[in-house]
């Protein structure tokens, strides 16, 4: 069985209880990882990482990235795959069975439905998993292999980004998507009119102002432009080599957490 961890701030007791209730209901052994808070990120580390993406990262975003990276280090050290969840992931009843099955050879297996389209490779699906050419968003539920962990850790010092953007940077990891998806973030369910059973406001939701068009900020615009240029071949290949669509999901699986009532 692939071990499973969820990332949770010490002060986020409601989220912890939510994940523990799900684990009990599903018969899933789910361990807690104490997340780094913004206050845990020292100034030196923040300064080294915050300016490496397409806009300046917030201290909260750096803390979330480093929390994920701590579990990537565990994967690399143990030389064994790990399923990693954020504490607002609503889990499918099919998840425990999936974690007991033999794993295909990918760096990352995305377990999540995030309600955004992504690029899938055409003709690269076995009906249960579909190969991803380029993902976009969501790091609430994924399975990482030791090779994937080592690749991610090797890149973090020079290419830091918010956790999902970092994981899904073009060409970094070989990825596939479980279909139908095995997890959905609470805020995604809420947006679709489904009660997720937990509050949907997270520590990531802090205001960010627009980036001023100054000489100091040109590098961020340049990085965004490079990202868009990398997408051009994918868009050109749509319909021939790639499909641009949302992952398949059965939202009826993700009922409210009845054990809280």
Question: Model-flagged regions — what are they?
Answer:
Residues 1-85, 89-261:
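An acidic/histidine-cluster motif and surrounding catalytic segment
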């Amino acid at each position: 069985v692939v071990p499973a961890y969820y990332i949770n701030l010490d002060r986020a007791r409601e989220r912890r209880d939510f994940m523990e209730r799900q684990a009990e209901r599903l018969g899933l052994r789910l361990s807690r990882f104490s997340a780094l808070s913004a206050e845990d990120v020292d100034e030196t580390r923040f300064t080294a990482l915050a300016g490496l993406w397409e806009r300046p990262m917030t201290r909260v975003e750096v803390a979330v990235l480093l929390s994920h990276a701590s579990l990537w280090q565990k994967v690399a050290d143990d030389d064994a795959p790990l399923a990693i969840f954020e504490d607002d992931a609503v889990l499918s009843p099919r998840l425990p069975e999936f974690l007991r099955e033999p794993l295909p050879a990918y760096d990352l297996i995305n377990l999540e439905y995030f309600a955004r389209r992504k690029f899938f490779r055409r003709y690269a699906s076995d009906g249960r998993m579909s190969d991803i050419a380029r993902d976009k968003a969501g790091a609430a539920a994924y399975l990482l292999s030791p090779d994937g962990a080592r690749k991610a850790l090797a890149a973090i010092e020079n290419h830091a980004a918010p956790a999902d953007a970092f994981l899904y940077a073009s060409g970094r990891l070989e990825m596939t998507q479980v279909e139908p998806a095995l997890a959905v973030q609470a805020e995604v369910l809420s947006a679709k009119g489904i009660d997720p059973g937990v509050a949907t406001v997270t520590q990531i939701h802090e205001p960010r102002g627009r980036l001023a068009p100054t000489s100091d900020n040109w590098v961020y615009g340049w990085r965004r432009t490079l990202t868009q240029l990398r997408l051009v071949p994918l868009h050109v290949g749509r319909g021939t080599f790639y499909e641009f669509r949302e992952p398949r999901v059965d939202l009826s699986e993700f009922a409210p957490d009845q054990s809280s009532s």
